[in-house]
Amino acid sequence: MIKLIATDVDGTLVKDGTMQIDPEYMTVIKELVQKGIIFAVCSGRQFISERKLFAPIKDQLLYITDGGTVVRTPQEILMVHTMPRDVWSGMCRMVQEQMPHCDCFVATPDYCLAEDAGSRMFHWLRDSYGYDIREAERLADIPEQDIIKFTVYHKSACEEMCAPLFTPAWKDKTQLAAAGKEWMDCNPLGANKGTAIEFVQKHFGISPEETCTFGDNLNDIEMLQNAGRSYAVANAREEV
């Protein structure tokens, strides 16, 4: 019997970077929750964006946000991974100094920070994803201690842009995962959607065999592997 369903969002339930979801999904999810099934939104998005997207049923869901670095109910954070300052600030400086065609931002459990409020990335996150994103004068020097994720952005080929320099430099210090064509998510080591699902399973006493997951991209692979039933959508990357 399935007790936990977890799904990715962008590329799985909605078109990347949009806030339009089929109303029928809301009806189905509500029916599943009424049957006692835990429904988890498992996305690279931040909490506020997930809440806006699922507004009609926002208080009935479990939230796995920022690529698996945070697990929370509507009321409280159950689990959070943070990243060492030297790691995220070092990645930030590399992007800003050596990758001129890319942009970047950092995430806390509740909001994001980026340098240029007029940039394409900033506007897309704020206006299309519904993010709470704030401008920082010098991103690498912000005082925030609870950084949970660093993300590189390129308008069409982020994975390829990161391959020559960024990925080799940081692949052993962070958990890297491409998220669509535009993003490279960098999580604390050991933090991904799969470890978040494992936490949820242990927290609620649910086995992998009682878990069903849906995804489409490389950052969904660990989540799909930790479920007795896992499904890649038709448009998923071949590796998935």
Task: For each feature predicted by the language model, list its residue ranges.
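Asp-based phosphoryl-transfer active-site loop
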Residues: K3-T18, L224
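Short active-site oxyanion
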Residues: G36-A40, D59-L61, K149, E209-T211, ...
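Non-catalytic pre-domain segments flanking phosphatase-related domains
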Residues: M1-T7, K30, Q34
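Asp-based, Mg2+/Mn2+-dependent phosphohydrolase catalytic module
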Residues: N226, S230-V240
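Active-site phosphate-binding/coordination module
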Residues: Q20-F122
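Active-site metal-binding loops of divalent metal-dependent hydrolases
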Residues: V9, R45, G215-N217
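Short, well-ordered beta-strand core segments
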Residues: I5, Y63, S230-A232
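Conserved acidic, metal-coordinating active-site core of Asp-based
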Residues: M94, H101-F214, L218-M223, N235
